[in-house]
Amino acid sequence: MNSTEYVTKRHKDIRLAQYKKNEKSNILIIGDSHSEDLVNAVFEAGLNLKKDFSSYYIPVRCGVLFVKDKKAREDPNFNCQRFSFFDEKLITQISNSDEVWIISSWKESDIKYMEESLNNILILDKKVRLFGTKNFGKVDARWFVNNEIDTWNTQIFSKKDLIKLRNKEKINKALTNISNSYDIEFVNTQHLICKGKDFCPNYRDGNIISHDGDHLTRHGAKILGESIKNLLTEKNNK
C-alpha cells in the first residue's frame, strides 16, 4: 500500500457506515483530507475498540462548513452540492451519533463562516469537537538525502514554509477563540503532534511524520492517535 492509499483507505471503508448496536459511543468524523488522517489516527491508537467510528468527506475546495450560502468560499469549478452538511444521509448520521468531530485544512476564508457553522451544528444537540489544522513544511526528499540522519530532527524551514506555518498558527488561535465562545472543545492537532509547539520538524522518534507536509504517514498517525487517546483519558479522569 503506497502513502496515498494509506491516507484514504480507512476513511472510505467507514464512510457513513452504520453504527453497531452495542455499548460503544458513536463518533462521526466529518472533514476533508485531514479527516482521513484523523480516522487513521484513532484506528492506529486502537480507539475503535471502545468507540464506533463513521466518516463523511467534504473536499477542502468546498469548505467543511455547515452553512447554506458559502459560494464565495467554494471552488466554482467543483460541484460542491455533492458534498454538503445538508446531505440527508449525513443529517441522519449526525442524529445517530453521540459525538461529532469536525476537522479540515482550515483556511482564513473559513473563519468568517465558523460561528454560523457551529451554531447550526449545535442546534442538532450533539457534543462537538473541533480539530485544528496542521502542516509540517515542504517535504524535500533531496534534503533528507543530503543531510545526515542525526540532523533530520533539526530541520530548518524556508521563509515560505515559515509564512505558511505562522498562518496555520493564526488560524488555530482564531478557531480556539471561537470554540471557547461556544463552549466547544477545540483540539489543536498541530500541538498534539508537535509536543505543544506551533510547528516542528517532519522527523520524530526515528521516522517521517508526513510524506507531503500535510498528510500523515502511519508513523505520524500513530503519534497523533496516541496523543488523542491520552487527551481523552485526561478528560474522562477529570
Residue locations for each model-derived region?
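Extracellular/periplasmic envelope-modification machinery, especially enzymes
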Residues: 1-238
